[in-house]
């Protein structure tokens, strides 16, 4: 049995107090560096929290073998508190974002020279705001050197995200409110994540949008020009990106143009599942949960089997929305083709099947059986 505990600490403090709460909604997305939180609490909790306080959401499960059986799901700073009376019912709503909000919202002037992408991020995040930046895998720095990184009376965040994308990296907030810098696409099958119709999927929705799609993509940098043509958008729409702040070679400007094409062409499959990640049975099956991922997270590459949508492949999680009310919780997961964030390197996953096609069993028992088979194969 799992449960959710929500705590609050005053700004600048690490002394947390537990809150009573009615419902919680957490959103994590590859397109937004910060996690966002919407939290509804009884009016009795109003005096316990204030703007800029820190809120953490923790997931408790008796099968978690480390950290006293609980893990953080997110850590945010409070942006807004609203007191509401509705048909005699009184409650407060709290909105919050990850600590990286301070980098995004702040504007100042600075420069770094001859530093790697990781070092630049550390200078900005840790040096100015005390936010740790961890490269995944840990203990190494595979990022490339940026000759000059400068910003003037602005937030450096957009430049930093562009610099990461130029190198095939992505920034994400982690559960503790720090930042991860990792290559696009993390293999989640190693922790036995899987999404399959008839097993753990409650509903499926597929969306195709052309609002941000163009026929021609042009990326300009240091006198070089990269182009990509989308034959599936047969019109005169053109998008030009000026990345003159970065000295990109021809390969990189071509890659950026191609990634813009894939991203704006995207077809999103959204599924709803019970819980926020692995089932109790899956968590219990690990000898230790230390260094294991237990929650669905953006940037995961995950086996997907949804015959009704014509899907039997590996897809990337672009967004997760967790919801909970008392003891009931579920989540909505947005899936895209890996090339949307990985470029051509991600196209190989369209042929990486789930291994479920043709199997007759359905339901939870089949789900557990499939997980057990994957675990045996991994040993």
Segments (PLM) and residue ranges:
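Acidic, small/polar-enriched beta strand-loop surface segments
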Residues: 2-7, 46, 161, 165, ...
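Short, surface-exposed secondary-structure junctions/capping segments
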Residues: 33-37, 91-94, 208-218, 331-338
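Terminal peptide-recognition signature
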Residues: 39, 124, 317
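Charged- and aromatic-enriched interaction segments used to assemble
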Residues: 86-209, 372-379
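Short solvent-exposed strand/turn elements
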Residues: 88-106, 327-347
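Assembly/oligomerization scaffold segments
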Residues: 1-109, 166-168, 189, 193-206
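Generic recognition of long tandem-repeat/solenoid scaffolds
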Residues: 37-42, 94, 179-181, 271-273, ...
């Amino acid at each position: 049995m799992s449960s959710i505990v929500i705590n609050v600490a005053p700004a600048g403090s690490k002394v947390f107090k537990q809150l009573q709460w009615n419902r919680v909604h957490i959103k994590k997305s590859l397109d937004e560096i910060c996690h966002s939180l919407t939290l509804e609490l009884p009016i009795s909790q109003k005096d316990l929290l204030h703007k800029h306080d820190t809120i953490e959401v923790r997931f408790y499960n008796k099968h978690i073998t480390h950290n006293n059986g609980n893990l953080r799901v997110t850590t945010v700073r409070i942006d807004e508190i609203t007191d509401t009376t509705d048909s005699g019912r009184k409650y407060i709503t709290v909105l919050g974002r990850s600590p990286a909000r301070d980098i995004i919202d702040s504007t100042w002037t600075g420069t770094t020279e001859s530093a790697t992408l990781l070092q630049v991020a550390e200078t900005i995040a840790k040096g100015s705001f005390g936010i740790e930046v961890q490269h995944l895998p840990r203990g190494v720095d595979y990022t490339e050197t940026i000759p000059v990184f400068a910003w003037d009376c602005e937030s450096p965040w957009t430049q930093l995200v562009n610099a990461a994308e130029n190198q095939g990296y992505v920034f994400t907030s982690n559960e503790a409110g720090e930042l991860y810098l990792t290559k696009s696409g993390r293999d989640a099958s190693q922790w036995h994540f899987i999404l399959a119709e008839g097993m753990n999927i409650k509903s499926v929705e597929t969306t195709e949008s052309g609002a941000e799609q163009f026929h021609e993509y042009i990326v300009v940098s240091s006198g070089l020009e990269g182009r990509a043509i989308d034959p599936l958008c047969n019109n005169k729409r053109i998008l030009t990106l000026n990345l003159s702040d970065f000295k990109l070679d021809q390969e990189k400007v071509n890659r950026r143009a191609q990634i813009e094409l894939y991203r704006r062409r995207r077809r999103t499959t959204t599924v709803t599942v019970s819980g926020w990640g692995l089932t109790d049975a899956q968590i219990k099956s690990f000898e230790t949960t230390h260094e294991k991922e237990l929650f669905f997270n953006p940037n995961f590459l995950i086996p997907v089997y949804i015959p009704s949508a014509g899907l039997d492949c590996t897809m990337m999680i672009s967004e997760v929305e967790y919801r909970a009310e008392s003891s009931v919780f579920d989540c909505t997961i947005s899936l895209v083709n890996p090339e949307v964030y990985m470029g051509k390197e991600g196209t190989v996953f369209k042929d990486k099947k789930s291994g479920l096609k043709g199997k007759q069993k359905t339901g939870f028992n089949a789900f557990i059986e499939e997980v057990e088979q994957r675990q045996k194969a991994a040993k």
